[in-house]
């Protein structure tokens, strides 16, 4: 662990041996952030993506420069179908640690597959349109739009959830059940 003031390697002491700064609270922040990251990692490994997302976001609230937590949060967002949020996390990670950062590979992988990136963007636009239809009461149009979204991007958790909600509202209980099972499979 490095001192947040001078960058020197810290010891077990509550003070930096190099600059004399009190690092007791800083060490506690890092420890708490890492504990939340580890919990998020465990949840991600068993595909509890929503739980992992929450723990990783809390880890970053405690210490925003936790690069492994930020990169994993990006992966969780990507797995949940939120490519924009994933890219945002990886870009922030890259800005905090420009060298030796696996976020480079993630960003490159997404950007090199332009066709897939365009498909994700199209799915997001259609999802937003479906959301507008649902809010204005055009539930049949929302269902049509959401089915198009999911044909483009089948791991888009928010689209599955909105389709389930609209299906419940239109008394299509079997469709809602099917969509919720898909969400449970993804997350």
What are these regions (language model features)?
Residues 20-29:
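Short Cys/His-rich micro-motifs in 6-15 aa windows
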Residues 24, 60-61, 92-95, 150-151, ...:
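Conserved structural position within tetratricopeptide repeats
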Residues 45, 79, 113-116, 135, ...:
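Register position in tetratricopeptide repeats
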């Amino acid at each position: 662990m490095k001192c947040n003031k001078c960058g020197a390697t810290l010891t077990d002491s509550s003070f930096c041996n190099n600059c004399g700064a009190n690092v007791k609270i800083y060490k506690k922040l890092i420890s708490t952030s890492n504990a939340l990251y580890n919990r998020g990692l465990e949840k991600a490994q068993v595909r509890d993506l929503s739980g992992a997302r929450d723990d990783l976001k809390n880890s970053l609230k405690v210490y925003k420069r936790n690069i492994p937590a930020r990169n994993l949060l990006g992966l969780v967002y990507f797995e949940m179908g939120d490519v924009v949020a994933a890219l945002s996390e990886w870009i922030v990670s890259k800005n905090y640690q420009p060298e030796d950062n696996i976020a480079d590979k993630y960003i490159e992988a997404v950007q090199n597959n332009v066709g897939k990136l365009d498909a994700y963007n199209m799915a997001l636009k259609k999802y937003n349109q479906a959301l507008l239809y649902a809010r204005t009461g055009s539930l049949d149009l929302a269902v049509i739009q959401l089915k198009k979204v999911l044909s483009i991007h089948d791991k888009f958790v928010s689209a599955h959830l909105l389709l389930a909600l609209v299906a419940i509202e239109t008394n299509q209980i079997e469709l809602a059940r099917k969509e919720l099972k898909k969400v449970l499979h993804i997350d």
